[in-house]
Amino acid sequence: MTAAATRIAIITGASSGIGAATARGLAAAGYRVVLTARRKDRIEALATELHEAGHDAVAYALDVTDRAAVDTFATAFKKVAVLVNNAGGALGADPIATGDPAHWRQMYETNVIGTLNVTQALLPALTASGDGTVVVLSSTAGHGTYEGGGGYVAAKHAEHVLAETLRLEIVGTPVRVIEVAPGMVKTDEFALTRFGGDAEKAEKVYAGVAEPLTADDVADTITWAVTRPPHVNIDLLVVRPRAQASNTKVHRES
């Protein structure tokens, strides 16, 4: 167990995909991981898995869009070393002309307001740690657009701006802000959720792409960035599969 063992890393959206993989990565790096998500059964199962592997983990059911719940949660921690803002997601792929405003609102609430809520609530504890790290998991959608992605792109652009502005505002404090922006990542739920459970549409997203990123690939990236020396700030790390050159340029094998 490393010197990080007594230090706390909080991961939002830890019930599956990148969040769960990041929890495993940070636990292996020696952090005491705090798993948060709405699906309590999932994070409790992950906490059990981590305990059985010899790691320190605890699960908290939390909806990041519920500010009162977030504030109550934050009172449990005097010092936090790492916050990974992973909770988020996409809904729908309709053009702007016909997009569902409810989807846009929900994506903004989860990706942006959720990140804002948790970051604001835990910033005092991150500062108190003496060398806190805020990770914002954005997306390449936060750095370029694509047809049918308006709502998600808008939310992720806002999340990118949140990270960039926070870094400017807290410079000189013992907290760094790291933005990790993944491209095409194939997880069990992202595309399936985006298309309302339509497995055929979800699979088409990755059709012909030999090796899209995995949740573990992104988790490795986050863990690497977090474990740099405290004076080193990875402002922005964009990670894509080799087959993807941009949001709209992807090599697909026939």
Which residues fall in each region the model found?
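Substrate-binding pocket helix/loop in short-chain dehydrogenase/reductase
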Residues: 94-96, 100-105
